[in-house]
């Protein structure tokens, strides 16, 4: 397994170009299964999960090519089953189910790897499709969906806010007979992006970005060209990188209006922030950040995917900051690793209490999940000495060429190939 070796401390500053959003690119790739004409999706990041999704679409019979943009022609899809060997590495593959059953009347997806029903809400995807008239069976580790004729529009009230299930229901409803209303829908910018992509293909959707999305079913979707929005979490990660190293950064190809909660907290931490139409600049003027209190919640509140980065910020900030995680359980696995580097924190239930220290020391640490691993790499950039981050395949799932981008900002980082 590959590792990162990081030599610190360094001040991170300069310019970085933000990639397309993984969490919009993936649902958009699967939504292309709904289209009866070729589709071109631009600004798709080069990531492991994207490669896996493209492989899966090919196995279903779609023609998939990448030359800068991703081109998908789903006219000849003739396989309706997403097999375990591809699904086991990526939960996003559940998004194939809605488009398959909506367009072809049948679909099967292996239960995502290590996913017990109820822990991550696959059950919300299932109940949504059932309310649209699909018959669902769980057999031999597969979710099997079928319908005679077309799905039927429905008034769906979601038990809890779920980005993934909102995508599934919205995609399936585009080809359903009649009108579907999703109440308590997720409001994330990536949901808006997928809705806009579907509208480009001919879907009739309104209310995206609010908690009530209305979809009027159409007979078919055509082709089109669409550009994925910039990755707000990658943007936030690089802004934090500059903040904790007391540096200055400009993020290009960014979308500032998707980051209001994060920018507000960075300003509270003492950062000088300016925004343009497609750029964000942050300047710490050489000052140490101040600790901030953060509570994660669904959009437009503070995103859970920025929690680990702000935990790190608090751990090197002036003062004590509280970080409360309300979206996912077990999302503090980076804290013991950061403690190995000299951080001072206590975890009480779903809150981590961060006591800022002047400096961190390099250590051997292990990445546990995507965002936690990014925070460990950033910690290595500002720690004294050498930090080795193990299991970085987590990072490769969500950040495009993170080491190249950090190096351009002044980091001393190298990828060490695993045996």
UniProtKB/Swiss-Prot annotation:
InterPro entries: Enolpyruvate_Tfrase_dom, Enolpyruvate_Tfrase_sf, MurA_subfamily, RNA3'P_cycl/enolpyr_Trfase_a/b, UDP_GlcNAc_COvinyl_MurA. It is found in: Cytoplasm. One of its GO terms (molecular function) is UDP-N-acetylglucosamine 1-carboxyvinyltransferase activity. It is an enzyme of class 2 (transferase). Keywords: Cell cycle, Cell division, Cell shape, Cell wall biogenesis/degradation, Cytoplasm, Peptidoglycan synthesis, Pyruvate, Transferase. GO terms for cellular component: cytoplasm. Pfam families: EPSP_synthase. Cell wall formation. Adds enolpyruvyl to UDP-N-acetylglucosamine. Belongs to the EPSP synthase family. MurA subfamily. This is UDP-N-acetylglucosamine 1-carboxyvinyltransferase. The lineage of its organism: Bacteria, Pseudomonadati, Pseudomonadota, Gammaproteobacteria, Enterobacterales.
């Amino acid at each position: 397994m590959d590792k990162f070796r990081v030599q610190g401390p360094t001040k991170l500053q300069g310019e970085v170009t933000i990639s397309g959003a993984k969490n919009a690119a993936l649902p958009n790739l699967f939504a292309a299964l709904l289209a009866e004409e070729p589709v071109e999706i631009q600004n798709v990041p080069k990531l492991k999960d994207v490669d896996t999704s493209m492989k899966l679409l090919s196995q279903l019979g779609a023609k998939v090519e990448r030359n800068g943009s991703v081109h998908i022609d789903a006219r000849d899809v003739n396989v309706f089953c997403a097999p375990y060997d591809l699904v086991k590495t990526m939960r996003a593959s559940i998004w194939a189910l809605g488009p398959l059953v909506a367009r072809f009347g049948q679909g099967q997806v292996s239960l995502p790897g290590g996913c017990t029903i109820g822990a991550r809400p696959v059950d919300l995807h299932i109940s949504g499709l059932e309310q649209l008239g699909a018959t669902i069976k769980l057999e031999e580790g597969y979710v099997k969906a079928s319908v005679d004729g077309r799905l039927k529009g429905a008034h769906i009230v979601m038990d809890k806010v779920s980005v993934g299930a909102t995508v599934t229901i919205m995609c399936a409803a585009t080809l359903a007979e009649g009108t579907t209303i999703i109440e308590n829908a997720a409001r994330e910018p990536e949901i808006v992006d997928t809705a806009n992509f579907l509208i480009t293909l001919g879907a009739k959707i309104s209310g995206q970005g609010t908690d009530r999305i209305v979809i009027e079913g159409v007979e078919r979707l055509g082709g089109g060209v669409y550009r994925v929005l910039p990755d707000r979490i990658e943007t936030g990660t690089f802004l934090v990188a500059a903040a904790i190293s007391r540096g200055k950064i400009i993020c290009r190809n960014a979308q500032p209006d998707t980051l209001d909660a994060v920018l507000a907290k960075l300003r509270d931490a003492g950062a000088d922030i300016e925004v343009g139409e497609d750029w964000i600049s942050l300047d710490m003027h050489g000052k140490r950040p101040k600790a901030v209190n953060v509570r994660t919640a669904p959009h437009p509140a503070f995103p859970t995917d920025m929690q680990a980065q702000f935990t790190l910020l608090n751990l090197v900030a002036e003062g004590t900051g509280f970080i409360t995680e309300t979206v996912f359980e077990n999302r503090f696995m980076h804290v013991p690793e950061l403690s190995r580097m000299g951080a001072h924190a206590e975890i009480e239930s779903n809150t981590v209490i961060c006591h800022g220290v002047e400096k961190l020391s390099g250590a051997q640490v292990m990445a546990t999940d995507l965002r936690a691993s990014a925070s460990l790499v950033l910690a290595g950039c500002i720690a004294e000495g050498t930090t080795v981050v193990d299991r970085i395949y987590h990072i490769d799932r969500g950040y495009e060429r993170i080491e190249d981008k950090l190096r351009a900002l002044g980091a001393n980082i190298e990828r060490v190939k695993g045996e």
